[in-house]
Regions:
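Alpha-helix-loop-beta-strand connector modules within alpha/beta enzyme cores
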Residues: 1-7
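Charged (often Lys/Glu-rich) extended helix/loop segments that serve as interaction or gating elements
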Residues: 9-157
Length: 157
């Protein structure tokens, strides 16, 4: 940058974010229920917009794959979370062969996943696991409901 604009007399800092670590994160989510609708089928999963807001906020495309591929007829689904909001979706219009209880990998969920997550609807933020080769380390545990209320106080009676 200095070669192009010269010495500006200041320190230049950059924040590369998603470009470096976006593809390093995967959100795992379980299929809770398959709901057939009129003209549209839904996969209700246990992750929600509070865990990964990018699809709802930016209409970001997230690649979604079953952790264990299954034989059978693939259907077109919208992946939605358990929060009762029209924006609670992780992916739309995906061709997948799945059953209740299957585990899904929502890819490219790194970079800003945790910092953009929230406790909306009293949902604890997801755990974070670092995988290095064949080793896995829990680097942040899932928040409990008790932890969400820990900083609150009752009013005196």
């Amino acid at each position: 940058i200095r070669e192009t604009v010269g010495d500006l007399g200041c320190e230049i800092e950059i924040e590369p974010g998603r470009n470096i670590v976006g593809n390093a994160g995967i959100l795992l989510s379980g299929v809770v229920f398959l709901k057939r609708g009129e003209g549209r089928d839904f996969l209700i999963v246990d992750a929600a917009m509070n865990d990964l807001i990018r699809p709802a906020l930016y209409q970001a495309w997230m690649d979604v794959s079953p952790v264990q591929p299954r034989d059978g007829e693939a259907r077109n689904y919208d992946l939605v979370g358990p929060i009762c909001e029209t924006g609670d979706f992780l992916a739309k219009d995906r061709e997948l062969a799945l059953a209740e209880g299957d585990l899904l990998a929502v890819c490219s969920a790194g970079a800003y996943g945790f910092v953009m997550s929230s406790n909306y609807n009293t949902r604890g933020r997801a755990a974070e696991v670092l995988v290095d080769g064949d080793q896995a380390f829990e680097v942040r545990r899932r928040e409990s409901v008790q932890e969400l209320y820990a900083g609150e106080s009752l009013l005196p009676t």
